[in-house]
Structures are given as structure tokens and as C-alpha cells.
Amino acid sequence: MAQEKPDGRPRPSGPWTDRVSFADGAGFAYVPGSVLTTDPEGLTAVARRLWEKDRVRTGRTLGPFTEIAGVRDPLVLAREARLAGIVAQPDHVFFAHCEPCCPPHPAASCGGGAGANPVYATPVYATPVYATPVYATDVHASPVYATPVYATTASPARASGVRRSSARPAPEGVDTTSATEAFGVVAEGPPRVIVLDTGFAGTDAPGALSTTTVRPASAADVDAPDEDGNGFLDPASGHGTFIAGLVQQVAPGTEVVVHRVLSTMGDGAESNIVQCLADLEVPDPQRTIVSLSFGGFALEQAFAMEWAVRRLQAMGVVVVASAGNDGSCRPTFPAAFPGVVSVGAVGPYGPAPFSNYGPWVRACAPGVDLLSTFFDGYDGKEPPGDRGVDTDKFDGWALWSGTSFSAPVVAGALARTIAAEKCTAADAVKRVVDEPALMRIPNLGTVVNVI
């Protein structure tokens, strides 16, 4: 239940309440008490001027940025520091893009600006778009969906209205044979896709991934189904495992390394993400893709994360990021950073209504009811629905929707191109995304055909 603000508007609440604050009227989230700056001494001086008795403390060093903790009001301090010419920003919190129409971004209800642009009142849905081949075919004929990644069998609706995970077990009748056969094919000198997400399933890993080149970066990068111990699947549990399976389906044999930067509730602090990006081991950067299926809005821009992304890009690494599920044209980060391959979602008949859009979105790929790997043998406390279907009993496969899953499809397409054509990641982007002859949807970019 959302809490009431003094003005009567609902205040976002949820599993992030103790570790996330929301900026009223601005639609972004941040870590309470934390500011990132390139001038820790200058920022400390501003903090002491504002709150004489407060003692802020220096935290981690993140490249040129330093984490300052113990701040009474991060938004006030960041604003005053910027007025003094100091680079400073809140430690933004970003969320997994895994819950379409839920709403997907908890900060969106903080103010009118975050989701104020109705998707159906934009050029994305203008008449000329509907004349394209994406809309001219049915789900079985569309080249975008002629792949085992997309499950065509309808699945039952969730019986409970309680917001938990939006992942659903693969229903009876969905053929996972072709998807399973895509795993375990090892290419010569495979490219690497690095996934920053909720981690990778440990002992609950699906059998389809047991003999492949998918692995967690360390023992600490483990995805878990129910970290809060309430008996229900957490909202973003399995997110990283699902994404890793998508990459392997599209690009068999690709080395997939999964890092944990998000909680199973779906939130992750910018400082933790920046530290992970800065510490990545990239032995062959020109054949490496980083896939990010999270994002959010920012005070102005997430400068610390942009530094980390630009650093990787300068090495030759390609960064792919999901555009978000807010149904808005407002840019989200990291997808909107320069040079990032930002990815929106399409369904079998055109743009997914939940997908973010705009000139900053470079590509789109299937993102509705995708079939991929999930926890094997997990059965939560969700009661069976009126059709007798257990909606949180998983056997290693699941259906999920969101731009979170469109991004790894594109990352996989790039990895497959690198392996097949012996090219760099940058050259793969030119062929898969930037080639002028490719089909495009206004405000959603190039349609990435995953056949």
C-alpha cells in the first residue's frame, strides 16, 4: 500500500523503503545520506556550511568520483555544491526493467513528469508505422518472432493481484526443445557478454545452462529466489539468470559472465554499479559486450555512471542497455548515454505499449512473453489459480516480458555477429544496428532480427 504524502499524493513504498529515497516531482530515486563528487574537500566544506554540526565522511573512491556518506539531505547538498562549481550528484538508484505496466519504475509516482507522456499520443503509434511489415504479419510469420526465444502459447493470468514477480512458469504446451538445443554449442574463440544484474542462479541453476559457458563472476554473484524469506518469489529474482539464458539462445557458445549489482527486489545503487563497471576484467575489450537491463531517471545526468560507461567504450567495449518500461519518451540512464545501444521492446504486432521510446532509442527487439532459463525446482507459496495452475512453480524455464529482455537479445545478436564474421564489437553494431538498409520503427530504432 502506498503511503500518503502531505499533499495527498501517494508516496512509493515497497521493499526499497529503508534504503531508497524518492525525489518528489522529479521522478528519480537515490540512496539516503550519500552524494558522489569529484571534489570531496569542496563538498565537505559546503556540507559544513549548511549543517555546522553534521560530520560527513569520505567513502569509496570510484574513479574520479568519491562517495560522501552521512549527508543530511543529498539533494540540497548536491544543488548547493553545483552552484559553487563543484561536480556533485545524488547516488542514484536504478531498477530492473522487468515489470511492464506495473508500473515498472517505483519513482514514477513521485511526480507528474516521470510518466506524463501517454504512449498512444506519440509518433510511435502514428499511421505510417502501422504500414510496416512488423504489423503486416501474424505472430508465426513475423521474422522478428520466428525464434524459440518467443513462446507462442498463451499462459494463464496470475491469480493474485499482489505485486511480486512478474515472471511466469512456462505453461504446458510450450516446446523448449529448440531452445534447449541452442545451449552448449561452443564457438571457436567465443566473444564475451558481461551481464550486470541480480547475479546467476547457484544450486538452483537450470539444467540447460549446466554445460555452457555461463557463469557467475564470483561466489558472491549468486541469484536467489526468495532473499527476504517470506515464501514468495522476489520481484526481480531470476532476472540475471533469465537474461543469461537469452544471450545463450541467440548466440550459442558465447562466454557469459554475470555480476550482481541489483538486489532481488530490483534496486541497485549507482555507486555499486560504477564500482563493478570500473573493476571489470576485460581481457579482449574489442570482442566484449556489456549488457545492462536496468535504469532510471536522474537529477540531471548520472555523471559517475557515464564516466564508467565512457571508460569501457574507449577500450572498445560495446555497452547495450534496456530503454525501460515506463511507456515514456523521457530518457533513462544508462540507456541514453552517448554511444550506448539503447533497446526498446516490440511485440508480435509492433511496439510493446510499455516500452520507452524516443530518438535516443537505437534498436528494438522482442520483449513480450520471452522464454528463457529460470530457477529449477522452485515452488513458492503462491496458491494455484482458478485453473489449478501453480503460478510460481518453476522447472527451469519461465516466460517474462520487458525491455530488460530485449537488451540481451540484441547483445546476443551482436555476439553472434562477432563470432560468425570475425569482427569487433563496434563493427557488429554497424552491421546489426546502424546499417542504413535495415528496417526501422520511428522512435524505437532498428528492428533486430534474431533469426
Identify the meaning behind each predicted range.
Residues 197-199, 317, 332-419:
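Extracellular S/T/G-rich loop segment that most often corresponds to the catalytic His/Ser-adjacent loop
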Residues 183-188, 245-249, 267-291, 301-319, ...:
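Mature extracellular/periplasmic domains of secretome proteins
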Residues 247-267, 272, 422-436:
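Short helix-loop-beta-strand segments that form the rim/entrance of peptidase-like active sites
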Residues 286-294, 300-303, 308, 315-317, ...:
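C-terminal subdomain of the subtilisin-like protease fold in secreted/lumenal serine endopeptidases
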Residues 105-255, 275, 282-286, 372, ...:
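Active-site core segment of subtilase-fold serine proteases
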Residues 2-36, 41-136, 141-166, 350:
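Autoinhibitory propeptides
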Residues 91, 260, 291-295, 322-323, ...:
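A cross-family glycoside hydrolase active-site/sugar-binding cleft signature
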Residues 202, 325-330:
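Active-site environment of divalent metal-dependent phosphoester hydrolases
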